[in-house]
Curated annotation (Swiss-Prot):
Its EC number is 1.14.11.27. It comes from Mus musculus (Mouse). This is Lysine-specific demethylase 2B. Binds 1 Fe(2+) ion per subunit. The keyword Metal-binding applies. There is a cross-link at K830, K863 (Glycyl lysine isopeptide (Lys-Gly) (interchain with G-Cter in SUMO2)). The lineage of its organism: Eukaryota, Metazoa, Chordata, Craniata, Vertebrata. Residues 404-413, 722-772, 915-933, 955-968 have a biased composition (Basic and acidic residues).
Amino acid sequence: MEAEKDSGRRLRAIDRQRYDENEDLSDVEEIVSVRGFSLEEKLRSQLYQGDFVHAMEGKDFNYEYVQREALRVPLVFRDKDGLGIKMPDPDFTVRDVKLLVGSRRLVDVMDVNTQKGTEMSMSQFVRYYETPEAQRDKLYNVISLEFSHTKLEHLVKRPTVVDLVDWVDNMWPQHLKEKQTEATNALAEMKYPKVKKYCLMSVKGCFTDFHIDFGGTSVWYHVFRGGKIFWLIPPTLHNLALYEEWVLSGKQSDIFLGDRVERCQRIELKQGYTFFIPSGWIHAVYTPVDSLVFGGNILHSFNVPMQLRIYEIEDRTRVQPKFRYPFYYEMCWYVLERYVYCVTQRSYLTQEYQRELMLIDAPRKTSVDGFSSDSWLDMEEESCEQQPQEEEEEEEDKEEEGDGADKTPKPPTDDPTSPTSTPPEDQDSTGKKPKAPAIRFLKRTLSNESEESVKSTSMPTDDPKTPTGSPATEVSTKWTHLTEFELKGLKALVEKLESLPENKKCVPEGIEDPQALLEGVKNVLKEHVDDDPTLAITGVPVVSWPKKTAKNRVVGRPKGKLGPASAVKLAANRTTAGARRRRTRCRKCEACLRTECGECHFCKDMKKFGGPGRMKQSCIMRQCIAPVLPHTAVCLVCGEAGKEDTVEEEEGKFNLMLMECSICNEIIHPGCLKIKESEGVVNDELPNCWECPKCNHAGKTGKQKRGPGFKYASNLPGSLLKEQKMNRDNKEGQEPAKRRSECEEAPRRRSDEHPKKVPADGILRRKSDDVHLRRKRKYEKPQELSGRKRASSLQTSPGSSSHLSPRPPLGSSLSPWWRSSLTYFQQQLKPGKEDKLFRKKRRSWKNAEDRLSLANKPLRRFKQEPEDDLPEAPPKTRESDQSRSSSPTAGPSTEGAEGPEEKKKVKMRRKRRLVNKELSKELSKELNHEIQKTESTLAHESQQPIKSEPESENDEPKRPLSHCERPHRFSKGLNGTPRELRHSLGPGLRSPPRVMSRPPPSASPPKCIQMERHVIRPPPISPPPDSLPLDDGAAHVMHREVWMAVFSYLSHRDLCVCMRVCRTWNRWCCDKRLWTRIDLNRCKSITPLMLSGIIRRQPVSLDLSWTNISKKQLSWLINRLPGLRDLVLSGCSWIAVSALCSSSCPLLRTLDVQWVEGLKDAQMRDLLSPPTDNRPGQMDNRSKLRNIVELRLAGLDITDVSLRLIIRHMPLLSKLQLSYCNHINDQSINLLTAVGTTTRDSLTEVNLSDCNKVTDLCLSFFKRCGNICHIDLRYCKQVTKEGCEQFIAEMSVSVQFGQVEEKLLQKLS
């Protein structure tokens, strides 16, 4: 042998032949499967002239027909009118199917010649389908593309009768259907029998041999394009026996089954025909032209014996599970349970299933986090306070998203036989009256007749036909008759399920006691054996689910994580504001009237567009602009609804109108208020909304409320805002002189009116003309705006009624502290300029109109001014509003007589408060505009040096601005810190925003801007000066680095004081070395000004814990903080934290996501996985959190799945915080310290306090960690002190550990 090896001889290796059952043997089968009959002959033959198919019209095909005829004969409808069918547009093609179900969706394709199945992607099949007929090598046929839960689903609607009889819609638990997310028919992911909607795509020449649809299902079949030819064989016992023999013979290709039976019918279906094939009918199909067909399969209660017979045939012919009806016997159990429940009101479902299906009252918890401050503005399609007609309209809106159960008509009776009038959980067999909470829940969930239903369930009446063994409370006041077909079906189901062996009964988990259920069905059959078949034909299904409404959800679900303080305060307000209600659609604005856009993230989530349907939100473009109070809202004081329609006097109308406070959320009549010394602030942007006098008197302020659709209103075609702008522009073009004269006469006219009538007149005139309530300058065209500015600057004169005031000086409208802090900036103003600004503002305050409106009015209007309008406190009537549209600020400049001194003080105090508020809104919106429009500009330009002599905004440009020039409002940055950085700076040391030096731009970019061919980047910012210039021009003896050494010893509060000294110190004190850590912990509101301040300081550590920061804000921040290393986001929402999943996330060292709402294993996977939004050139496929050293995960609902991700993606992890994680156990620690894991050697500190599943065993796993120094097991109930002492003793050989506290182990130095 050695010689043979050395000789270099190589023997040939012989591989053993391996056989694969999936091996393609199509070449062999092509020879074997040669058809033994001529298909062309069968198409021309006159032998198949049976008359089984009945032609009908859609209007005659209703549920009453089903109860009478039981769907036993084939039906053809030459027109789909009256059937309730919905189909795509006529130009819909197979290519559109691919777009809607996904080009990568795998479909089962049948090779017609070999009758062998294979798989293709939709993209591949569409390419084949569009290939010319002459170039097709083979004939492929798609007959099993189920498209539920895809975008195609809601373009196709089944016949109404099919929805009413389908077991899937009416028997299968609805909450299981809602859990279905997988669009394919993978059995492992299937939550219900997914056979409702199929798309069949066949090319010319395709032939499907004789077959019976799986499970004995009936079939609806609509020829959308092309045509079909059917051969039909009735399911007699003889024919079924022949069929079974034919299938088992294996000679299907040799024998045409239609020739073996007594009678067979051939029928041709043309384009637009709808066909119904009953259960058990044997049929073959030929495609004469390329066709596109939509159809579906159903099981129903009117031919159950045939359905069971076909299922048994499938058992005997050994049909593969892939081609059978899924969950067949499970469905049978649910059918029995639903019939028993709807007839006797006794449920055999588990308690959990009953709660899910609204059959009993779910336990409701009261939580301080139950309501968010914006919940009164939540606009959902199924609002819980809709009027009955509004509910119908909303159900029509939701019709395409719902299933057949949602379309099931409710029985006309008000008795317990109605599935919607169900007994509560605590109602027992003795007829005990339900508890009050259950009654309240029923009242919330039932319709207008619910009171009678509750009475009927709580006080049952005796009936002679009480089902045997049924409690007295379950007796219906009106007997429900079952058809003979249903009775036969129920009997067949009971016999079949009883005959099954235990291992094949397939009892679903929702059935609590299957044997008791069978007995209950037998009792029902005994009681209904004498039912009148005529009375059973009612046209109404016996079985249907209770309609789910929005009341099943928590009404005030918070949108984001609230801080504890705000949550508690909100709950207190909730208890006092009993009349608070969720607002509903106005149904008048353009947003309410339009259809879904199909493009926004809410639309993409909807089931009708192929999404999972989890968000339950309406389209962004359909969010109401002006949501109204629901009809159930009543006054908190008198308990009555709004009665403004009962009077004609305008002042009386307002006093009887319901107003909702945007701060305390109380709904009240203004006339019912006892507080008269203060004034309310009416919100023009939202109907029936104000800041009530009580909150205003207490000095509370709230965020301006608007309808959720207001910010999208300008995008709506034909929106109200666009119409207002066009109308306003037309009026300005036609009547400029008339408006000016009206403005001049307005103060005189109003000063003569009675003071008490001023509020009502002004309010209602402006309310009636909605055009003036929502005037927004940012929707104007840029050329109109610039032209108007030029005209107003030329026309300004001391005597004119309308003067230009681009922005009031900051010091004039702010508090004394703010004015003192602005001294430095005011000194930079030119001598005459400051006086001119103050004179103008004083004149506008002292005129007669202002005194009347501020001193005598109980109410005032406030509006959010657009970015280029000024905050205005003096209210204007319609005439002054019209004049204001021609200039940024319009108002009478003539001074009136001085009023009483007290009124003057009150007026000035309110004026300052309002201007402060408006100014803050102005600056916030300006920065929001910058965030959206120029993301990178602000970070660079905000650090540009401040000019030695800034100009006041009152200076107009000396030449008109061309359209291509767009001045930048933030080109100088924001000097000082935002006032909201209160935790770092303190209440008394907030630096002011400086006066803007250039006029604001229009909101939309000028149309004549020509796009550059190359990227234009901003110039680099100039470095801060090295020395401090003095008044005489010389430089201070101490240079910048010396000053920086001094500044490093100052607190952030002191730095803010220094920033107000001069421009040089302002820039020096903003150096990032002085702001390595910024703490905004528990800050109530994160504003754009605060974000800009953070960006300017470039911190290394940022604490945003327990704030309401949004995803957009956090994304904007992390894009501009490349040096950020420590980020604290504890208590925020997952929506905000998900901003870290982007490729722009900095390489953090410390990440704190403790108590983040909604952060679970799936979210951890998104957080730790490599980002998918890499920019061109970014080839790094590693996690952006790979440098994490310290990770805090306390209070999260995570499991070992997340720990595996941590081990994989965080090789440097040293400190891990897992306290209050209830799923962490000893196995989790074993996983962290296993051989080969990076955490075994890198972990130094682990916090497992309050992890109740951790035991002493975990300590033995920690022995593997070579660098462990700190183990916190405090408050772990299953960890003992003895176990800790044993760990210390065993570790003492190599490392000395001690118990600093009980169960707190620390390495001793």
